[in-house]
């Protein structure tokens, strides 16, 4: 009888031990899966941040971030290489330096008295710009008959999966090599308030072997001038045949950019040239949407006086009236009337 009692006791203890061991293994596996999930989520978010960008030239502005046109643009961390000259620089500072460089190149492109830069260097700038603003090339290869488009595609595609931050750094370095004093020249130009803006130092020629590239550069320039608040150069673009409602890759017109950056004088000049105040970007937002979200009351009121529609809805179903959270009396009256 004692033997049976001892055997039963051993079996019970064995079952309890097996249960506890199984429970411990289950807890360890659950912890491992949760940790792996967190790691994957972090990796996905980091990749997303590194691949998001703004696609068009960014103008020189006192603001560190664009409020609407660049609100979804996220930059990854700075390159961690020990020999990187930009190590430790805040992403906003790098963005500002890149914005200044791209604005300089855009301004330079519209000047016919240009310093000639080889096609090879121009293509390098183009490829770096596309990586910095759009990420790795995913576009199909153009036809061999379209020489310029194919050359530009190759310049972009050969950079592979270069991080946007590295592309911005290389772009700035290349512009600095071509014209070491460009930063000083740009600063002097911005500081001359009330004076007529003269040439911005040596400027870069467009790709010379096909006309389409020159037109594309000018269209980029008109958006850059609107962002910078460069009224005279913007008007020169329009006089040279660039449409006042020319759109960038996100469907934004110069008026969108002028409103986004708070340039009332540019907005007035564009409206005088018959700019469409109700033009929509790719997300269905008009310049008035931008003014409302950016809380630029003077610009919003100006647009409304120019017959901007307060009821146009964007892709999310929101009109400027819907988005307006500010206590603007004249806007409240329109809300009440609707």
UniProtKB/Swiss-Prot annotation:
Effect in UniProt of substituting residue 126 to A: Normal arachidonyl-CoA-binding activity
Post-translational modification: Glycosylated. In seeds, localized in the outer integument.
Protein name: Acyl-CoA-binding domain-containing protein 1
Ranges of biased composition (kind: Acidic residues): 77-89
ANK repeats: 217-246, 250-279, 283-312, 316-338
UniProt cross-references to SUPFAM superfamilies, sorted A to Z: Acyl-CoA binding protein, Ankyrin repeat
Membrane-protein topology: Single-pass membrane protein
Keyword Transmembrane helix (UniProt): yes
Every ACB domain range: 94-184
Pfam families: ACBP (PF00887), Ank_2 (PF12796)
Glycosylation sites: 35, 41, 191
Gene Ontology MF: a single term: fatty-acyl-CoA binding
GO BP: fatty acid homeostasis; lipid metabolic process; lipid transport; regulation of seed germination; regulation of seedling development; response to abscisic acid; response to cold; response to lead ion
Protein family according to the UniProt entry: Belongs to the ACBP family.
Gene name as annotated: ACBP1
Residues that hold an acyl-CoA according to the record: 126-130, 152, 171
Protein localization: Cell membrane; Secreted, Cell wall; Endoplasmic reticulum membrane
Species annotation: Arabidopsis thaliana
Organism lineage: Eukaryota, Viridiplantae, Streptophyta, Embryophyta, Tracheophyta
Function: Binds medium- and long-chain acyl-CoA esters with very high affinity. Can interact in vitro with arachidonyl-CoA, barely with oleoyl-CoA, but not with palmitoyl-CoA. Confers tolerance and binds to lead ions Pb(2+), probably by promoting lead translocation from roots to shoots. May function as an intracellular carrier of acyl-CoA esters. Modulates negatively sterol synthesis during embryogenesis and gametophytes development via interactions with SMO1-1 and SMO1-2; sterols serve as lipid modulators for gene expression of homeodomain-leucine zipper IV transcription factors.
